[in-house]
Amino acid sequence: MKKILFPTDFSPAATNAFIHALEFAKIVQGELILLHTFDLPIYDNQYFPENYNVIFDSLQLSQFDAFKDEIPKLRAIAEEQNLDKIKMSHRLMDGDLIYNIKKVIKEDKIDFVVMGTAGETGWGTFFLGTNTGSVINAIDVPMLSVPLEAKFKKIKTIGFTTRYRTKDKKALKEVITIAKKMNAQVRCLYVKTSTSDVSETTIKKWDTEFAKEPVIFSVIPSDEIKETIIDFILFKEIDLLVMLAYKRNFFVELFKPSLTEKFANTSSIPILALREKKSRNFEEVAAG
C-alpha cells in the first residue's frame, strides 16, 4: 500500500487539502499518515530551576490535547466524502517542520506528500516563503501542493510541461499512469523558443510513441515561457499541473501576481511536483 504523508496545522488551507489527500489516496490505493508539528519555546533553565520540566510537560500535553481534538473532525470529513475506509494514522512531533517531514519520509518510506497552502496572492506567496514552499525543495518524493482556493473536483485534464528530454519522457509515462487511474487526459505543452534545439524529428517520435496513450501534445512558439504556460492552464482548462525538476525561483516567477492577476483561476489548481532526483522510482510508486 502506498504511503501518503499529510502535514497539517489544522488551518482552513490544510483542511481543504485533506480532501485532496483522501481522493489521491483512493486513486493510488494508499494510506494517509497525518503529521502535526509544533515548536516548544526555548527556556533557560537557570531561571526555572524547579518547574522547568513541569512547563514543558504542560506545553506538550496542551499540544496533544489540541491534536486529539482535531483528529475526529478530519475523520468526520472523510466520512462525509465516503472515504472513511482510507487507512489513517497519526504522528505528533515537536521541532522543525521540514526536518520532521524528512524524518517521517525516511522512517515510514513515504511515497507522496500532500500539503495545503494559502495566501492573498496565491502561488506567488506560496513559493516565496510559506512552509509548503520550503518543503517542496527539501524532499525527494513527489509532492501535491493544494492552494486554499482549489476545492476538490474530478480531475479531467492534467497539464504537463516538457522540453522533450529523456527524463521528461520518463516523467510523462509516470503521469500517464496517474491519469489512467483518474480516467483523465494529459495535455503536454512544449514552449518552443527562438533558441530551441529540439528537432522536429524528436517531436514526431514522441507523437508516434504516445499515439495510443491519452495524451495530446501542444507545441507553441514563444519566447514568453511563463506567460505561455499561464495561458495554457487557462485555455486548456487544466485541473492539475505537473512539473518536473523546476527550481523555486521558476515557480515564483510563473505565479507572481503580475502574471496571474488577469487569470484568477490559475492560482487555484493543485500542482504535482516531481523530483528529478531518483531516490525512488515514481512509476513504481504510482502503480497500484
Regions found by a protein language model. Name each.
Residues 1-54, 157-219, 238-240, 266, ...:
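Small/aliphatic-rich secondary-structure junction motif
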Residues 13, 121-122, 167, 249-251:
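Short glycine-rich, flexible loops that bind phosphorylated cofactors or substrates
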Residues 53-66:
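A short acidic, glycine-rich active-site loop
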Residues 72-113, 210-261, 269, 276-288:
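Structural beta-alpha unit
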Residues 112-138:
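Helix-enriched interaction subdomains in cytosolic or periplasmic regions
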Residues 116-117, 142-148, 271-275:
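Short beta-strand elements of ligand-binding domains
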Residues 128-131, 202-204, 255-260:
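Charged helix-capping and loop-helix junction motifs
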Residues 132-150:
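Short, structured interface segments
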